[in-house]
Amino acid sequence: MKQRRYPPAPAQAYLFATCLVDVFVPQAGLDTVRLLEREGLAVHFPRGQSCCGQPAYSSGNPEQARTVALAQLDLFAEPWPVIVPSGSCAGMMRHHWPQLFADDPVAGPKAFALAERVFELSEFLLHVLKVRFDVSGVAGQPPETVVLHTSCAARREMGTRDHGVALVDALPGITRAEHQRESECCGFGGTFSLKHPDISGAMVQDKIASACATGCDRLVSADCGCLLNIGHAARHQGAPLPVEHLATFLWRRTGGGAKEQA
């Protein structure tokens, strides 16, 4: 994977919330904004944004994916970074949007320029903002043992597994547990879980059993698709495995939740 050059910390940024965050886990979007604003950024949310087109693309419908992606290209007109709280959606925008419009003399340059400004959340926090969370005023939070789940796209396409690890490991009171099936897919895979439910179900059962064997308090991930899949399966099985988006976890463990309640 080509090593990426990171820009200086900006004053403003866009949020591409993703459709799963918007519909199912809006708290993750709010906490992403809070994390960025606490670092001094003005965060902009273009209201016309929708899906990144990945479901259509991964189902073999590139024309539908092009239609969805084309509607987004002019929404992020300013030269600000586009922050995505999902490695899967960030990977689609950064790596596949330019391919979708490679033969389009108008949309192609736009897609390529936008892709260069797309950052997965943990990548942006660590390498662009270079965050050093101030936890000096955080007291009374119990220690936690967590499992960090990195989605397949985040791990293999965006290469952001180590970014999430670095952020979690920097938090006092947090023990990150590794497990045997850490690098395996959770079975979601977008439309894969719909097309192959039996295989998907077996994969997520393996993931849950392996994570629970560590005795962790919760599973943390930066991808809502994985969280929805693992969380639903764990509840269905009665497995003691709460799930939480990385943005919400970071905000909560660095005092954000306490400040809201004060």
Language-model segments: what does each one mean?
Residues M1-A262:
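Iron-sulfur cluster-binding electron-transfer modules in prokaryotic oxidoreductases
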